[in-house]
């Protein structure tokens, strides 16, 4: 039983304080009430004098001035056409900040306000809305509604996909009722300055046949909507007056019985606000917290004050103060009240005969005696209604006075089950003005509904959908003022954010207004990586900015969904390396891996985190404080990484980068004072968008350091200026102009056109075009005495193949050195020693030595994990470990070849002499190698010709990495032995510092800087891929260094750069301005080939057959930049292959059929030796080609702070490519192979004219000059492609496979050209051998309808669980399981320290639970995943990271249309799994909004679509278990994708690629060559990503991203118009 602290029941309204705004206006507080007592309105109770201008409590407290003249009421304004355009408007900022209101044209006069406050029933005439239906059931809007509201309605229920059959208007109630053809009812209501539109949860029965207003009629009142059919059927739905308004807006009006009748109240930020009707502004009523504002069964308004007192805001009475928190309440029409309180997650019901009566505790139980854990309560005149923690509804007769318990009976909800599903949940109760009770319910998708309780008051029936609604609400006085300029960060493409009153605010570009986010912070800073970071309670967290839409429920309950992206910030996981106990008070961030923090002692430390992990890269570096005086208030870094510190006395100091980053300079480092324009009075410190130092003394001036001078600006406090187009947008637009193509009407096929003139390609656009002289110099000849480029390229290639790359010599030499060290180490006799893990565990260095011991453990763990990874990699290749990870003790014995050395016994001897741990994976594997006589063969590098490295060894570098790790473990053994000498002696700081220094030198220097470690950490395992990617990097370094390089020439054209320097600058700004899912790529391609044909003579065919064949090779280099989650993703790619081709062609002279004369008859003699021979020739050809290509790529991530330096290094050409790559992080190396087969056909019709250059009848060789004009057609008849690749990173491996079956007619093209050719032909007895070359001018139009499928499987090294993982899991479980037992257990788990123990407790409790909701399903799945991860991590294994099946189409119609073979298959085999088109069609059939989105995506031209499928949860869980138990490998996972029943639709993505490519194709005389360079960009047009719950077939919801997610111009204009009127669209 709870203790009740009694207070006097009387409560003056001046004590009634504002209440907390519920998380949503739907979470009503199920309150109680007492008898009604006279109470004055909150405004009349002395909150301010009505005769004086009211002061706005929100914002900075500025006053609102009364106006001498005012416009009409909002209702009248809305009824007058064009009023919003003609009325003068005050600046919005004055309203947001609570400043003076210059004009208030939309609110009533003071006299009208007085009438309203005093409860007069006089009302303004209803607005004329003029909503009608046309003959197709589409809404037609007149001018009666506000323009902005009309726009929003047109964008939602006004769409074509929403046909209506009946409409009724109630002008007195400002209400429109609608019925659609499915029987769903809609209502649009206006009430003063509020507008809502919503629809019924269920559907009414509709008559058969064609529906219209002739056979369906509607009638509506504020209380009810009735639908009648000509057949006599009728259905009615309660509207319950203002109840839906109150639930949707949170605005409640005092009843007429209250002295403040008509006064409007609402909650905002935990406070109670009242509407000042004279000015139409919400004003805070009191500083006391209130929550759960709601109307109760007696029609009066109640709220909970300070969480412990129930207050009747209408009568002024209050309950006793409860010692426990009030979680729900209720009051009935008889004045009886019920209160639910909660302590330790257990609730207690209290009943009171009147609000101020002594509470009577009542126990709740079922008939079988089981307790009921109540979450919501409601009292009617006769019954007690309870909703429990599972959302189940119960009822019991109202307990009589003194009854200690109530026996509950489950309520019957068949009608609600039929509409919302059996798994719906009752979450609360609501009441209308007449005290009628309705239940609040949530369906499976989380949408909220109001449900009338039926005639018996106990069985809920379907009512109205509150989630799928449109709500326009007056927020004047509640909206956020713009933060001060000194507290604002401009994040460029991510908009603006600011810090105000301890909360991060963001600028909503859709409404042109500042809004508060849920993120709290004491500091908001911009890192040098241009990312935002917050400091709160000693934790530094990166901010992520949302660029997706809100979540939309799947189904047809998204009528009022308006796609829009609000750039809302959210805080990520706290950066590692600091604890809350450190009391960090200030920060300066380079990036998420490097930052400086000031702790509670005032000391500064530089923290470094290993990229991609939560491990520290080095111990925190204490920074010097010499010369720095006073207590540090704030710190920052400028663009040169100069560190600035501001003390609390307003003095500013600086320390150069070299002095604070280099520990060797710390002793001599000295902070220097900075002279400022406000000397000694600096109040705030920061940087501008270019990271220049910025200071302020007050809110009026900002001083920015520019060089040695200061620039002073006076912020105007105005809304941000419209953002200028991003450079990336500008370049994309330019490339779009250069890309010629369009979509064929009524199809999804795009045709693209390309032009070439005399071998020069890229003539498609004359607007984006390089000079011919520049292109000739770049591709063909440099007009200097240098060796021609093609010859030099070939010579370099031969040299590199034989001797490797000079820049990689440090890697070659280090391999040799490490092998020599290994031999030297193992040649020394070693005695039996304790393993390293045990040695470290036994160390006792006291509290001061804990950091040293922890770093020893971390380094040992790194080395053991690294050696295990290398050994497993080698083991898989050698057959000692199978695909599933199981060890094969038999191995694959083999003999060594010339110069090879077996590393296995040498490595094993070294490991046994310096054992790592008793469970060392590497040592176990090496013993298996030795025992099974399976060698680890490696050829030592030498200086001999062609032997600098072994390019045939697929794991040469991985083997050397194992050697390095083994040697490092031996060195760590020795260091640990020396540290062990200090164990138990309580060593001093000097001795510990010496050991720490030595450990750091080993870890970061000898080991960390080793070139073999760096290369293998990037993912390189062999020299072949290393040299390929090195070649790619080197190629682009040359490309951007040389102004006349082909890549530079085309890049300057695309960037419209005047010089190379200008191009590099524009390249930086373009890359930095890339938005999410945008990329830019620079391409260089060259190739050559040889071909021959033979004209066969003497055949019976009507035409001479021409067989032919050829071989060609091509190499392609690509450098791409794309926007990633943590910066800019960079990819260097090189691909190339050989293509073999055979052909068969023929032609026939059709002159006689077209002209009536043969070619011979039309021949004209020029002279005795030469003649002119015209003809019309029809020809055809069939060719088959087979291509084998290699792919290599290097991917890594750069922060925005690193990118400019990286591009400078790329273009300078003065640094080694390895140093350039060292700037990046999270590298991965990709190597793959592609095999493709194509069967093509072509046909041509040409008008030709030839002149024999040799004498007539010359034999056996003749020469001809021929000109022709003609048309061509070609098609790709058959094609098949198979490819596979592996991308290897330090912590992850990704396998990609693509095995595309034979596909028919993927491509077709038509062209026209004019050609001049010359050559010779040699005649033999069997036929003729032609040798011709040609030059042409032509245009080609190609249609592409290719389909490509691939499967991607990602494995990630399992990391041991950390506190953040358990925190995330408990948060998920806490929100999903709200029964007291689970809640109490989770509370206990949060207090535990060890993740292993926490996981064990959670497993014990949740192992046997079955998910009842989607949230519980997700929670249990997360728990299972962490279990697998923790188990695998303890064995140094990998877990499944990502797995998906993607299908890409260039024909967008295939998104919803099956191909021919699928259609035939569906007819022949009924058991076939659904195709992608089948899946999508099924979804859009149930979801009109999604259908509209897909249709809009398909309307794009020159676009491609990618459909991704993923494994269902149960299948994925099976695979994860199989990987854990080593029963499933890569091939088993890929095999599951062959059964479509294992898959679900993950996403639909449509993107657009634009490109400018320029180059030359040289005329061919047996041998031909080509050279091209290009710039391309890719942009996401739209992505629909799906989320699933327990139902793995039908999505629960979806989100939008890309262009499709952004609000259209009509919507943003409407939102801005509303904002100007002080109105907002909720949601």
Swiss-Prot record:
Q: Which GO terms describe its cellular component?
A: extracellular region; host cell
If researchers knock out this gene, what phenotype do they report? Mutant does not elicit plant cell death in either potato or N.benthamiana.
InterPro entries hit by this protein: AvrE_T3Es
Repressor as a keyword of this entry, yes or no, is no
UniProt motif WxxxE 1: location: 464-468
What conditions trigger expression of this protein? Transcription is positively regulated by the alternative sigma factor HrpL.
Q: Please classify the protein's predominant subcellular localization into one broad category.
A: secreted
Keywords of the record: Secreted, Virulence
Q: What is the effect of changing residue 464 to A?
A: Retains cell-killing activity. Fails to induce necrosis
For this chain the motif WxxxE 2 maps to: 514-520
Spell out the Pfam families in the cross-references: AvrE_T3Es (PF11725)
Asked whether the UniProt record includes Secreted among its keywords, one would answer: yes
What domain of life is recorded for the organism? Bacteria
Tell me which family the UniProt entry assigns to this protein: Belongs to the AvrE family.
Reported function: Major virulence factor that may function as a water- and solute-permeable channel dedicated to creating osmotic/water potential perturbation and a water- and nutrient-rich apoplast in which bacteria multiply within the infected plant tissues.
Write down what this protein is called.
Type III effector DspE
Gene that this polypeptide is encoded by:
dspE
């Amino acid at each position: 039983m709870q203790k009740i602290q009694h207070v006097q029941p009387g409560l003056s309204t001046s004590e009634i304080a504002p209440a907390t705004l519920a998380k949503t206006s739907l979470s009503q507080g199920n309150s109680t009430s007492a008898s009604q007592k006279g109470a004055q309105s909150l405004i009349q109770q002395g909150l301010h004098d009505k005769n004086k201008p009211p002061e706005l409590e929100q914002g900075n407290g500025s006053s609102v001035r009364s106006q001498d003249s005012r416009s009409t009421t909002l209702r009248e304004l809305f009824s007058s056409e064009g009023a919003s355009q003609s009325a003068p408007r005050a600046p919005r900022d004055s309203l947001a900040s609570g400043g003076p209101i210059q004009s208030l044209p939309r609110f009533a006069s003071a006299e009208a306000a007085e009438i309203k406050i005093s409860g007069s029933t006089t009302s303004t005439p209803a607005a004329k809305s003029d909503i009608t239906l046309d003959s197709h059931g589409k809404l037609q809007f007149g001018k009666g509604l506000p323009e902005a509201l009309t726009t929003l309605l047109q964008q939602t229920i006004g769409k074509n996909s929403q046909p209506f059959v009946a409409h009724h208007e109630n002008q007195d109630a400002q209400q429109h009722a609608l019925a659609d053809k499915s029987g769903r009812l809609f209502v649009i209501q206006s009430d003063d300055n509020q507008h809502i539109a919503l629809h019924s949860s269920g559907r009414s029965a509709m008559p058969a046949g064609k529906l219209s207003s002739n056979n369906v009629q509607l009638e509506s009142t504020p209380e009810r909507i009735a639908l009648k059919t000509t057949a006599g059927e009728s259905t009615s739905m309660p509207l319950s007056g203002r109840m839906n308004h109150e639930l949707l807006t949170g605005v409640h009006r005092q009843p007429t019985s209250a002295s403040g009748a008509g006064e409007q109240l609402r909650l905002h930020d935990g406070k109670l606000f009242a509407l000042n009707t004279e000015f139409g502004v919400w004003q805070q009523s009191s500083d006391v917290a209130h929550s759960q504002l709601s109307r109760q069964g007696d029609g009066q308004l109640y709220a909970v004050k300070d969480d412990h007192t129930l207050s009747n805001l209408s009568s002024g009475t209050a309950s006793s103060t409860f010692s426990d928190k009030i979680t729900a309440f209720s009051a009935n029409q008889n004045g009886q009240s019920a209160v639910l309180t909660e302590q330790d997650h257990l609730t207690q019901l209290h009943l009171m005969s009147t609000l101020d009566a002594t509470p009577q505790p009542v126990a709740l139980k079922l008939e079988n005696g089981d307790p009921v854990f109540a979450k919501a309560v409601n009292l009617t005149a006769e019954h007690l209604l309870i909703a429990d923690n599972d959302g189940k509804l119960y009822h019991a007769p109202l307990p009589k006075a003194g009854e200690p318990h109530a026996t509950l009976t489950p309520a019957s909800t068949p009608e609600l089950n039929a509409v919302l599903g059996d798994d719906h949940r009752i979450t609360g109760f609501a009441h209308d003005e007449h005290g009628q009770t309705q239940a609040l319910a949530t369906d499976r998708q989380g949408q909220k509904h109001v449900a009338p309780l039926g005639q018996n008051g106990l069985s809920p029936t379907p009512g109205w959908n509150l989630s799928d609604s449109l709500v326009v609400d007056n927020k004047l006085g509640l909206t956020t003022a713009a933060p001060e300029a000194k507290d604002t960060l401009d994040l460029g493409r991510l908009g603006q954010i600011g810090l105000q009153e301890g909360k991060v605010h963001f600028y909503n570009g859709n409404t042109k207004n500042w809004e508060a986010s849920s993120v709290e912070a004491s500091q908001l800073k911009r890192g040098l990586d241009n990312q935002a970071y917050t400091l709160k309670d000693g934790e530094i967290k990166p901010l992520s900015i949302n660029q997706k839409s809100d979540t939309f429920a799947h189904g047809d309950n998204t009528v009022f969904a308006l796609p829009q992206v609000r750039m809302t910030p959210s805080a990520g996981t706290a950066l590692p390396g600091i604890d809350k106990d450190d009391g960090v008070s200030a920060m300066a961030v380079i990036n998420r891996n490097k930052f400086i923090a000031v702790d509670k002692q005032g000391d500064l430390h530089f923290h470094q985190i290993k990229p991609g992990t939560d491990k520290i890269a080095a111990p925190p570096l204490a920074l010097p404080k010499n010369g720095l005086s006073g207590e540090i208030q704030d710190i920052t870094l400028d663009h040169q990484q100069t560190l600035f510190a501001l003390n609390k006395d307003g003095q500013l100091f600086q320390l150069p980068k070299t002095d604070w980053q280099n520990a060797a300079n710390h002793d001599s480092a000295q902070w220097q004072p900075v002279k400022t324009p406000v000397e000694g009075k600096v109040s705030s410190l920061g940087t501008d968008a270019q990271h220049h130092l910025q200071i302020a003394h007050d809110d009026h001036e900002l001083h920015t350091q520019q060089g040695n001078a200061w620039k002073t600006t006076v912020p105007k406090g105005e809304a941000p200026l419209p953002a200028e187009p991003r450079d990336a947008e500008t370049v994309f637009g330019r490339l779009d102009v250069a890309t010629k193509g369009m979509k064929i009407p009524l199809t999804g096929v795009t045709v693209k056109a390309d032009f070439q003139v005399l071998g020069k390609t890229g003539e498609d656009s004359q607007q984006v075009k390089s000079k011919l002289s520049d292109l000739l110099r770049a591709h063909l000849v440099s007009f200097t005495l240098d060796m021609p480029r093609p010859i030099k390229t070939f010579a370099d290639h031969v040299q590199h193949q034989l001797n490797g790359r000079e820049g990689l010599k440090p890697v070659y030499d280090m391999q040799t050195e490490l092998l020599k060290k290994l031999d030297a180490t193992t040649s020394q006799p070693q005695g039996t020693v304790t393993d390293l893990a045990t040695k470290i565990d036994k160390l006792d260095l006291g509290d001061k030595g804990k950091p040293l011991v922890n770093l020893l453990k971390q380094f040992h763990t790194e080395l053991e994990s690294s050696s295990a990874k290398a050994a497993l990699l080698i083991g898989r290749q050698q057959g000692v470990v199978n695909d599933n990870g199981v060890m094969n003790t038999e191995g694959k014995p083999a003999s060594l070849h010339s110069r090879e050395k077996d590393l296995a016994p040498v490595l094993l001897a070294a490991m046994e002499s310096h054992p790592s741990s008793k469970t060392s994976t590497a040592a176990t594997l090496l013993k298996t190698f030795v025992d099974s006589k399976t060698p680890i063969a490696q050829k030592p590098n030498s200086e001999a010709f062609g032997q600098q490295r072994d390019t045939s060894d697929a794991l040469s570098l991985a083997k050397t990495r194992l050697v390095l790790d083994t040697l490092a473990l031996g060195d760590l053994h020795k260091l640990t032995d020396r540290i062990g000498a200090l164990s138990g002696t309580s060593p001093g700081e000097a001795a510990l510092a010496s050991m720490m220094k030595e450990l750091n030198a080993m870890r970061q220097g000898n080991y960390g800087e080793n070139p073999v470690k760096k290369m293998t950490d990037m993912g390189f395992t062999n020299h072949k891929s290393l040299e390929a990617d090195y070649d790619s990097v080197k190629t682009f370094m040359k490309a951007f260094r040389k102004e006349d390089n082909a890549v530079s020439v085309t890049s300057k054209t695309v960037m419209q750069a005047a010089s190379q320097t200008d191009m590099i600058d524009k390249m930086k700004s373009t890359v930095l301005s890339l938005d999410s899912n945008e990329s830019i790529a620079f391409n260089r391609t060259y190739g050559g080939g040889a071909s021959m044909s033979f004209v066969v003579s003497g055949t019976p065919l009507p035409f001479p057959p021409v067989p032919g064949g050829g071989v060609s090779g091509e190499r392609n280099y690509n450098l791409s930049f794309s926007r990633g989650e943590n910066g800019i993703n960079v990819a260097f790619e090189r691909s190339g292959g050989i293509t073999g081709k055979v052909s068969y062609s023929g032609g026939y002279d059709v002159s006689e059929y077209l002209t009536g004369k043969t070619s011979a008859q039309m021949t004209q003699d020029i002279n005795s030796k030469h003649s002119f021979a015209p003809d019309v020739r029809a020809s055809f050809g069939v060719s088959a080609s087979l291509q084998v290509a290699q792919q290599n790529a290097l991917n890594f991530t750069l922060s925005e702070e690193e990118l400019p330096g990286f591009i400078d290094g790329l273009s300078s050409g003065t640094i080694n490519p390895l140093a350039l790559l060292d700037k990046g992080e999270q590298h991965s190396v990709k190597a793959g192979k592609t095999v493709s087969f194509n069967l093509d056909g072509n046909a041509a019709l040409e008008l030709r004219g030839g002149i024999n250059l040799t004498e007539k009848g010359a034999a056996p060789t003749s020469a001809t000059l021929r000109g022709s004009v003609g048309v061509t057609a070609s098609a790709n008849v058959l094609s098949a492609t198979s490819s596979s690749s592996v991308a290897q990173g330090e912590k992850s491996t990704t396998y990609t496979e693509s095995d595309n079956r034979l596909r028919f007619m993927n491509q077709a093209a038509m062209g026209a050209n004019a050609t001049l050719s010359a050559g010779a032909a040699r005649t033999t007895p069997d036929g003729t051998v032609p040798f011709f070359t040609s030059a042409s001018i032509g245009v080609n139009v190609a249609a592409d309808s290719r389909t490509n499928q691939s499967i991607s499987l990602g494995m990630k090294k399992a990391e041991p669980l950390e506190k953040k993982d358990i925190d995330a899991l408990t948060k998920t479980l806490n929100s999903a399981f709200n029964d007291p037992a689970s809640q109490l257990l989770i509370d206990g788990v949060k207090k535990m320290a060890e993740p292993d123990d926490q996981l064990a407790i959670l497993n014990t409790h949740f192992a046997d639970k079955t998910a009842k909701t989607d949230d519980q399903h997700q929670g249990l799945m997360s728990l299972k995943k962490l279990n697998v991860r923790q188990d695998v991590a303890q064995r140094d294994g990998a877990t499944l990271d990502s797995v998906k099946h993607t299908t890409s189409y260039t024909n967008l119609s295939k998104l919803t249309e099956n191909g021919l073979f699928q259609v035939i298959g569906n007819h022949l085999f009924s058991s076939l799994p659904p195709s992608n088109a089948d899946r999508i069609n099924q979804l859009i059939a149930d979801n009109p909004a999604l259908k509209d989105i897909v249709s809009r995506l398909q309307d794009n031209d020159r676009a491609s679509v990618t459909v991704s499928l993923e494994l269902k949860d149960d299948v994925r869980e099976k695979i994860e278990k199989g990987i854990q138990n080593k029963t499933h490998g890569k091939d088993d996972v890929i095999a599951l994708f062959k059964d479509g029943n294992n898959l679900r639709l993950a996403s639909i993505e449509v993107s657009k690629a634009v490109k400018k490519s320029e180059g030359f194709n040289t005329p061919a005389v047996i041998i031909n060559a080509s050279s091209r360079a290009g710039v391309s960009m890719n942009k996401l047009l739209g992505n629909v990503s799906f989320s699933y719950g327990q139902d793995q077939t039908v999505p629960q919801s979806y989100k939008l991203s890309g262009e499709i997610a952004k609000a259209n111009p009509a919507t943003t204009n409407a939102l801005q118009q509303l904002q100007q009127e002080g109105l907002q669209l909720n949601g």
